[in-house]
Amino acid sequence: NVASFADEAQQHRSIAEQLAHQANLVNRAKRYLAYFQAYTSTFAEVQVLRSMYQQAVSQANIVGLCVGTRPDCVPDAVLDLLCEYKDQGYEVWLELGLQTAHDKTLHRINRGHDFACYQRTTQLARERGLKVCSHLIVGLPGEGQAECLQTLERVVETGVDGIKLHPLHIVKGSI
């Protein structure tokens, strides 16, 4: 349910316009990372992604990219593209929406991937020198404190550079 998470007005602006608008809102910062998060930011042909990412890094004060996606939507060609930006000196973060390390829960919430897929994607990204941040959800149905701690342990073991914890948030119209 993207409408709950994305400003409708932003959806009709160019990447340059969105970045300029957000920079004005947080004008105390001097440098920015362009954050591609809405939808799956790697689910397009590489030339389309290159155009989007290039629009972002060509803006003043943009020093890198944060690209949010699912672990099952990161083919080698996309990892190679992200490496091109890293090799040009940009800071590049691949943010993976894992949610949990428990396959039973991933199946229950219809994620379409398992923990092994996440591990593979993380390993491939880390081998290329990309920074990886994992998004996890606390409070998923059927999971308690023990499962949350197990997820954290398993994710840390993959060598990620960052973890973002989110509470379970059910949005009207999403179920």
Task: Show where each model-derived region lies.
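Active-site-proximal flexible loops/turns
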Residues: 75-77, 102-106, 142, 171-174
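Core AdoMet radical
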Residues: 2-46, 61-74, 91-117, 162-164
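Conserved C-terminal portion of the radical SAM core fold
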Residues: 116-174
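Short, surface-exposed connector motifs at secondary-structure boundaries
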Residues: 59-65, 131-134
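Surface-exposed amphipathic alpha-helices with a cationic face
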Residues: 20, 24, 82-87, 119-127
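Non-catalytic positions within long, well-ordered alpha-helices that form the structural scaffold/packing
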Residues: 57-58, 83, 156
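Distinct, well-ordered alpha-helical segments
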Residues: 46-54, 75-86, 146-148
